[in-house]
């Protein structure tokens, strides 16, 4: 009897034991998870990842609630992503339900703010599970390595960028002209004595230009006109005679003054163009009607008749407009010849006060020595403190020397004088190199027309993770950043050409060439370029030792002898 009682009890205990075992939720294999990208990569200052996970069949307890959190771990720190929660079939809730019998799949998107320590890190999934009120331990699972941080090199390649120059407006040869008008009475071509004074003053200016050491006469133009009233035949003869008489007088005066200057003479029979210009600038009655007649009719006779039909204004035209068109215009064309490069360079160092602002700024372009350029620009700020360009250009020199704070100080001083597009672009570079992408974008928005803007926007697009857009923005620019964009966009041939032609190559030029070698399976390019990079900047050896771009070279003796 006793045995009969114990046997059912024993069976019940066995069933209960197996039942409790079925509720156990243990360790999950990494095989249940895939991560895109397989090796995490920094993009636009973030480390994004898409995780596809699976709970296997007969794993997820019907009463379980599991919170899954992506955690990126590195030596001395970690960053947690957005968790996702899943529930069993008997749980009342709003989370994704996982079948006990069939299991279930899920997708999680996560992103971490990049910090340099993440260069050598691992991505885990951590689980917080409960079955009813009982806490269940599910071990964390490593699912990916990280982080390829090549895009973050923009913070280094920015030092190789080209700040905008406040350009000089120096012109060695400046073209100038001097005009005078000899006026005629209606239907007359003789030069009146009252107009000889004008001719005399004009000739005096010609003589002054001819005698000046830094001026050279190009030619003298004589343009004679007749007003559009009267027939074409009459006005043609009239204009031609005015041109002949003016040219004769001018030639006589030039010969007397012993001035050899070419004379180019022409005449216009009916000066409709001058008529239209004077009418449009006047306040006469029915001005718009007259201008409409000129636009409607091209035949001179019809134009004249239609305008005469506007009787209310014709007298005003005859008294105020037409007399101004009966003239010969004298134009002296000449060149002002500036100082030679040798003169400017010498004065810049010996007596800069003899130079104007354009000459002084130009002097800085005559040398490639940054120290001499700095001295010239500094002198320019003293002589011309209200000109922003010298301050801006001192900032450019400081930036290219790697002194970002000094550069920013000069750019801000330049902005206080004149917040020009060049200065705004340069302040944008400063913001970008300091990690403030929003401020950089604002500054670049105020830099329209600056020729270096495309390059600067390319740097911004790299920082934002827009690599194709960056490549397009850089165009044919030959800088480290341009090559970086091309590498990130996987245009390796173009990147190689860019790196080979960088104007001011530095350690990062070589480092990028090593990365390019790794991506194109060129081991000799990797080692030779990295060796050159480390020779210029020894700190890059440590970086290369953990840079996942070189992961397959971590067991290469030649590589490790450099990256140590």
Language-model regions, residue ranges each:
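N-terminal targeting segments with Sec-dependent signals, encompassing both cleavable signal peptides
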Residues: 2-513, 517-546, 552, 560-564
């Amino acid at each position: 009897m006793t045995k009969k009682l114990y046997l059912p009890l024993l069976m019940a205990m066995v069933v209960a034991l197996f039942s409790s075992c079925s509720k156990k939720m243990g360790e999950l294999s990494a095989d249940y998870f895939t991560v895109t990208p397989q090796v995490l990569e920094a993009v636009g200052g973030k480390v994004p990842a898409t995780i596809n996970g699976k709970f296997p069949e007969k794993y997820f307890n019907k009463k379980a609630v599991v919170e899954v959190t992506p955690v990126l771990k590195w030596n001395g720190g970690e960053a947690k992503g957005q968790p996702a929660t899943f529930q069993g079939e008997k749980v009342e809730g709003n989370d994704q339900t996982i079948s006990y019998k069939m299991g279930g799949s899920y997708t999680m998107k996560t992103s971490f703010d990049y910090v340099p320590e993440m260069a050598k890190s691992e991505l885990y999934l951590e689980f917080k599970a409960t079955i009813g009120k009982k806490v269940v331990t599910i071990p964390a699972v490593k699912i990916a390595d990280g982080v390829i941080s090549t895009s973050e090199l923009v913070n280094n390649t920015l030092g190789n960028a080209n700040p905008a120059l406040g350009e000089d407006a120096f012109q060695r040869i400046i073209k100038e002209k001097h005009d005078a008008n000899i006026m005629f009475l209606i239907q007359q071509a003789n030069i009146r004595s009252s107009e000889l004074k004008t001719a005399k003053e004009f000739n005096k200016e010609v003589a002054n230009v001819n005698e000046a050491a830094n001026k050279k006469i190009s030619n003298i133009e004589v343009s004679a006109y007749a007003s559009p009233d009267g027939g074409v035949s009459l006005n043609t003869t009239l204009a031609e005679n005015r041109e002949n008489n003016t040219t004769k007088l001018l030639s006589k005066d030039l010969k007397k003054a012993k001035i050899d200057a070419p004379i180019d003479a022409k005449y216009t029979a009916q000066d409709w163009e001058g008529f239209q210009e004077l009418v449009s600038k006047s306040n006469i009655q029915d001005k718009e009607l007259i201008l409409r007649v000129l636009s409607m009719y091209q035949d001179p006779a019809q134009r004249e008749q239609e305008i005469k039909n506007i009787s209310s204004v014709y007298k005003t035209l005859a008294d105020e407009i037409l007399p101004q068109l009966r003239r010969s215009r004298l134009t002296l064309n000449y060149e002002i010849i500036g100082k030679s490069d040798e003169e400017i360079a010498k004065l810049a160092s010996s007596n800069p006060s003899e130079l104007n602002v354009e000459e002084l700024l130009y002097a800085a372009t005559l040398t490639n020595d940054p120290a001499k350029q700095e001295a010239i620009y500094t002198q320019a700020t003293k002589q011309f403190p209200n000109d922003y360009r010298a301050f801006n250009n001192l900032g450019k020199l400081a930036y290219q020397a790697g002194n970002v704070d000094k550069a920013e100080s000069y750019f801000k001083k330049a902005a206080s004088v004149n917040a020009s597009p060049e200065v705004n672009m340069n302040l944008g570079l400063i913001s970008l190199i300091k990690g403030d992408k929003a401020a950089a974008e604002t500054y670049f928005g105020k830099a329209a027309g600056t020729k270096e803007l495309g390059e600067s926007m390319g740097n911004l697009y790299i920082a934002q993770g827009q690599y194709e857009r960056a490549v397009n923005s850089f165009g044919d620019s030959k800088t480290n950043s341009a090559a970086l964009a091309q590498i990130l966009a996987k245009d390796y041939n173009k990147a190689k050409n860019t790196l080979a032609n960088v104007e001011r190559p530095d350690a990062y030029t070589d480092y990028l060439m090593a990365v390019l070698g790794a991506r194109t399976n060129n081991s000799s390019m990797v080692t030779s370029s990295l060796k050159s990079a480390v020779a210029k900047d020894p700190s890059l050896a440590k970086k290369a030792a953990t840079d996942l771009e070189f992961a397959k070279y971590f067991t290469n003796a030649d590589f490790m002898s450099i990256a140590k």
